[in-house]
A protein has these predicted regions:
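Extracellular/oxidizing-compartment recognition motifs
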Residues: 2-378, 386, 401-412, 423-430
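Well-ordered alpha-helical scaffold segments within catalytic/enzyme domains
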Residues: 390-400, 436
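Long, structured ligand/cofactor-binding scaffold of large enzymes
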Residues: 433
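HEAT/HEAT-like alpha-solenoid repeats
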Residues: 413-417
């Protein structure tokens, strides 16, 4: 017998969106708004009590700009990362929907919702710097609807409004897609995503300006951690550790911190290549992208696992400083790209052709970040011409990507990543034959 599946509709326009846009429409005193913008993450929370009834379904819709992480009663919701996907915010902003029936506690129970907001490309990576090229769209903001349907047919709604509480005095002191993330564990907020937390010193969330774009459901695959890689080469040079993961990729490094003193600063620098002797990173091709993550220890680390949340890097090599007795098994590279299925493989007796195929596969995977990018590492990472046409509702027909999504945002990938790679591979063989 087949398992019964549930199907539902998202909000159909403004009439069904009860939540308000909330956040804080200004920088805080410690933030920087210049060519290397530094804006701390905003943390928002609310608590509510369910009715003394049995819950049938609970569905949550939210748009967190530029990026978000969602928690209910201390549990992170979903395995997506860097969500929602970027868009031309002047035309479209994307929301995600989640079935949270299992996470919401019924029967007159206390519940809590917590949302962390990152900057993404909404509050852009470079403020007051070439706005014609890298526009900014405002400060991070949230809109949320939680719809709880009880077995008796009644409905309870929890919406984002000015009753929510907000703080920017949390551990993510800065997040910037080009430059990386600064995380200060001394400023962690404890059980802020669980009911009963004392948020009396937090600010009241503001009702903030609306984004220009139309709010639409995200129908494309979310970005996820799709693979993990262990270090291929691990070497120490004085107080520096140089790690080669053996493959160029896009994502970040997750580090396990056994013990550390409060205030110790672990620095993780990323690069695609090293200098000739292999002892130093070569970051010249990154241009102004700093591609560095910082973790400031609180002294309570006990095999603490950490990675950045709202930035990613194109890299193969990593330099780690500020952490004594680092071991290779303390590090793992998490490879991030759109959740596209592999529907085939290629292998032949020619090693060069196999390598061409693998390189093409990795290149395409690294550049699928909600929209196809031109690169995942330097201070650009912009969509190509085709993507801009998709964003504007145009249609670009080619052998790999054919049809705009119904929301006019981007392509529907009819053929998955490995199919795209195969077509590129065939094209390369054709070129080689013609050259001969």
């Amino acid at each position: 017998m087949e398992r019964a599946c549930r199907w539902g509709m998202g909000p159909l326009g403004e009439i069904h969106w009860k939540g308000r846009w909330i956040g804080w429409d200004a920088a805080f005193a410690w933030d920087r708004e210049d060519s290397h913008s530094r804006l701390s993450s905003r943390y928002l929370r609310t608590e509510f009590k369910t009715q003394a009834k049995e819950i049938k379904y609970a569905t949550l819709h939210l748009c967190g700009l530029g990026m978000y992480e969602l928690f209910i009663n201390g549990q992170r919701i979903g395995d997506q990362v860097l969500a929602p996907a970027p868009s031309d915010y002047r035309r479209t902003v994307l929301y995600n929907s989640f079935d949270v029936t299992k996470q919401v506690a019924g029967g007159n129970a206390d519940n809590a919702i917590g949302v962390t907001l990152g900057n993404g490309r909404f509050y852009t990576m470079r403020q007051n710097y070439k706005p014609y090229k890298i526009p900014t769209f405002g400060y991070p903001k949230l809109r949320l609807n939680l719809i709880i349907e009880y077995t008796d047919g009644s409905i309870q709604r929890i919406n984002s409004d000015e009753k929510w509480r907000l703080t920017a005095q949390g551990p993510i002191r800065s997040n910037n897609e080009y430059d990386g993330e600064i995380y200060d564990a001394r400023m962690e907020l404890g059980n802020w995503t669980q009911p009963g937390y004392d948020d009396s010193k937090w600010l009241k969330a503001q009702r903030v300006s609306l984004p220009y774009g139309t709010l639409r459901g995200n129908t494309a695959p979310n970005m996820k951690v799709m693979k993990t890689l262990k270090p291929a080469v691990f070497k120490q040079y004085g107080d520096r550790y140089m790690i080669d993961f053996g493959q160029n990729m896009a994502g970040w490094v997750r580090i396990n911190i056994a013990k550390a003193a409060a205030g110790d600063t672990i620095c993780i620098r990323y690069a695609e290549r090293v200098k000739n002797d292999g002892t130093e990173l070569d970051v010249e091709n990154l241009r102004h992208s700093q591609s560095t993550d910082y973790y400031i220890c609180n002294g309570k680390e006990n095999n603490t696992s950490w990675s950045s949340r709202f930035s990613y890097h194109g890299f193969q090599y990593v330099e780690v400083t500020g952490y004594k007795n680092l071991k290779a098994e303390d590090l793992v590279a998490e490879v991030v790209y759109d959740d596209l299925e592999d529907n085939g493989t290629f292998e032949c007796s020619n090693d060069i052709m196999n390598r061409v195929y693998r390189n093409a596969w990795w290149g395409i995977s690294s550049n699928y970040k909600g929209v196809p990018l031109d690169c995942p590492q330097r201070d650009e990472r912009q969509p190509g011409l085709a993507t801009m046409l998709w964003e504007r509702g145009g249609k670009v027909s080619c052998s790999t990507m054919e049809t705009p999504m119904p929301n006019g945002r981007m392509i529907s990938v009819k053929r998955s990543v490995k199919t795209v790679v195969f077509l590129i591979f065939v094209r390369l063989i054709t070129i080689i034959i013609h050259q001969k």
